[in-house]
UniProtKB/Swiss-Prot annotation:
GO cellular component term of the entry, any: membrane
Annotated pathway: Bacterial outer membrane biogenesis; LPS lipid A biosynthesis
Organism: Pseudomonas aeruginosa (strain ATCC 15692 / DSM 22644 / CIP 104116 / JCM 14847 / LMG 12228 / 1C / PRS 101 / PAO1)
Gene Ontology molecular functions: lipid-A-disaccharide synthase activity; phospholipid binding
Entry protein name: Lipid-A-disaccharide synthase
Pfam families: LpxB (PF02684)
Length: 378
């Protein structure tokens, strides 16, 4: 491989900035004489990326917000494509944010540049025809999960399973006693974590339901305590409003600290989403619940091809953790499903441990190796 390797990376949100910085460290460890260009956040810039514009300009959530910013996003993407084609990097890596990065990858590949996509979109679950666009856009997909890699292999897309970075960050055995001490929770007695999501809409749909479930469980188990990590000040205020006028609960609200809550608890009532992977890695028995607007649910039922909604079940390939969705998610049903797991969640935990070890691949190192192998092939 020639000296002076030039690598372009494009990340669009905070999670991509974390993945990108880890990948950059691993690439530099293998190839010290390397230049990074593209778009990234503060972590990637700290690793030496010359970002063409602030990553925050790509971080847009919600249909209305996207439509409002669409002209700017399209203009930035067009300029970025032109700039990268002129820069002729040895490889371009799009990190997540597929609605933006796949279009960049496609144009660069048409211009004869090598392209990689890091973090698979959920094509295995819905809009599966997107795999055709992915096959045209990138020379290599870097997948965080083995079931994603199998999906791409079946559809003729070059893929490398690299593992998940969190599997290396989170210890195989978390120290429950130490986490409780840090949170000021009693060392003995049972603790249930309530995790109704990080977005306002999720908390609006699930917050009161989770609190109702907690009150039911407290009647059965008077010594039970609860901990609820709030993703932001707005989410904390939302929960505090829901607590007004209720029977008192032995509930500790946390500012962030979701990992501490998972380490400290005995079991989790959790919204479907990426937090279920964190709960799995902390080996905490869980029940997954989710509610959306009725029309949204009917549309998703028609679109989604996967039999499961939670990552633990997708990774296990079977119904390992209970999923109570929409009308099935009632306080009575959730309490009845959680209660046995507070007594014995060993069946879930055994599978969680095996999955954790399978995902513990040192994702950044694996991804760097795959990228450099791609560069060397030409």
């Amino acid at each position: 491989m020639a000296d002076g390797l030039r690598v372009a990376l494009v990340a669009g949100e905070a999670s991509g900035d974390i993945l990108g910085s880890g990948l950059m460290q691993a690439l530099r460890a293998r190839h010290p004489d390397i230049e990074f260009i593209g778009v990234g956040g503060p972590r990637m810039e700290a690793e030496g990326l010359s970002s063409y514009f602030p990553m925050e300009r790509l971080s847009v959530m919600g249909l209305v917000e996207v439509l409002g910013r669409l002209p700017e996003l399209l203009r930035r993407r067009k300029r970025l494509i032109r700039t990268l084609i002129e820069a002729r990097p040895d490889v371009m890596i799009g990190i997540d944010a597929p609605d933006f990065t796949l279009g960049v990858e496609h144009k660069l590949r048409q211009a004869g540049l090598r392209t990689v996509h890091y973090v698979s979109p959920s094509v295995w679950a819905w809009r599966q025809k997107r795999v055709l666009k992915i096959r045209e856009a990138c020379d290599l997909m870097l997948a965080l999960f083995p079931f994603e890699a199998r999906f791409y292999e079946e559809h003729g897309v070059p893929v490398r399973f690299v593992g998940h970075p969190l599997a290396n960050t989170i210890p195989l055995q978390a120290d429950r006693a130490a986490a409780r001490a840090r949170l000021g929770l009693p060392a003995d007695g049972q603790v249930l974590a309530l995790m109704p999501g990080s977005r306002g809409g999720e908390v609006g749909k699930l917050g009161a339901l989770f609190l109702d479930t907690a009150q039911r469980l407290l009647v059965e188990r008077p010594g039970l305590r609860f901990v609820l990590p709030c993703a932001s000040a707005a989410r904390r205020e939302q929960i505090e409003q829901m607590l007004q006028g209720r029977e008192p609960l032995p509930l500790t609200l946390l500012d962030g600290a979701s990992h501490e809550a998972l380490a400290a608890c005995d079991a989790v009532l959790i919204a479907s989403g990426t937090a279920t992977l964190e709960a799995l890695l902390y080996k905490r028995p869980m029940v997954v619940a989710y509610r959306v607007a009725g029309l949204t649910y009917r549309i998703l039922k028609r679109l989604v091809k996967s039999p499961y909604i939670s990552l633990p079940n997708l990774l296990a390939g079977r119904l390992l953790v209970p999923e109570l969705i929409q009308d099935a998610a009632t306080p009575q049903a959730l309490a009845a499903t959680l209660s046995p797991l507070l007594d014995d969640g060993s069946q879930q935990v055994e599978f969680f441990d095996a999955i954790h070890r399978a995902l513990r691949q040192d994702a950044s190192a694996q991804a760097a190796e795959a990228v450099l192998q791609l560069v060397e092939r030409r």
